Amino acid sequence: AIDTDLAELRSILVRLAKALAPGLDAKAVAGELRERVLEELDYEYEAQNQRAFARAYDGHPFIYVPKVHSRLSRRRVLVSDYVEGEGFEAVKRLPQDERDIYGEIIFRFCFGSIYHLQHFNADTHPGNYLPMEDGRVAFLDFGMTKRLSPDQIQLEQRAIDAAGRDDAEALREALHDLGFVANPDRVEAERLMEHVKMVGGWYMEDREVQITPERVMKMVEVTSDPRSDFFDLVRRESLPADELMGRRMETGLL
């Protein structure tokens, strides 16, 4: 049944891509999505992921990943340490300064894992982050993760550095090398920079940034609304299959 649903999703993605994003390799993206979903249903694979993150963050001052009990776990059963923590509704009632700390910890975990482990959790969902009494945040659910090669991470750093320096030509070149821009000569570098800053500038700016609902809606608009000033640019861009989970992590984090 799952394979049938995923095959139908692939068909829908291909049809949508032809109309909305001709540059997108929808079959490759659907294949990546299928692989990650099937991994998420395999609890033995999830246990391997969770053990890797638990080892990496063992003793960390503000990040906690529960230990997996391998002898009690099976392909369809995953047992780990019990965590006492607050839910997201409790987080929303915290004072602003405490919410800022909570948000910073999650940001550092999500993005820091990429650069420190070459491995990140793509399932960014508020139910997976539990503030603990000692000030740490517990991170749960490692069924959907993604590993990146050092070369890919280096290319992403090039793109972020170029955006931070406002070097539009270098940004266009880096995004071409990553596979986001197939034909750089057809994409104006300055417009591409403006588009990237509107969508991802919140984590490229070296200052405190407040993420408001209005800012999030603007990000959605410039990437998906045909009436957007950037929609013609979006149609010339692509989404490499290897970048799908990274973008999922970013949007979920927002």
Residue ranges and their predicted role:
Residues 122-126:
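Hydrophobic HxD+1 residue recognition
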Residues 29-33, 74, 83-105, 132-254:
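Helix-rich C-lobe and terminal helical cap/extension of kinase-like folds
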Residues 1-89, 101, 105, 116-117, ...:
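Conserved ATP-binding subdomain of kinase catalytic cores across diverse folds
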Residues 127-131:
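Hydrophobic residue at the +6 position relative to the catalytic HRD Asp in the kinase catalytic loop
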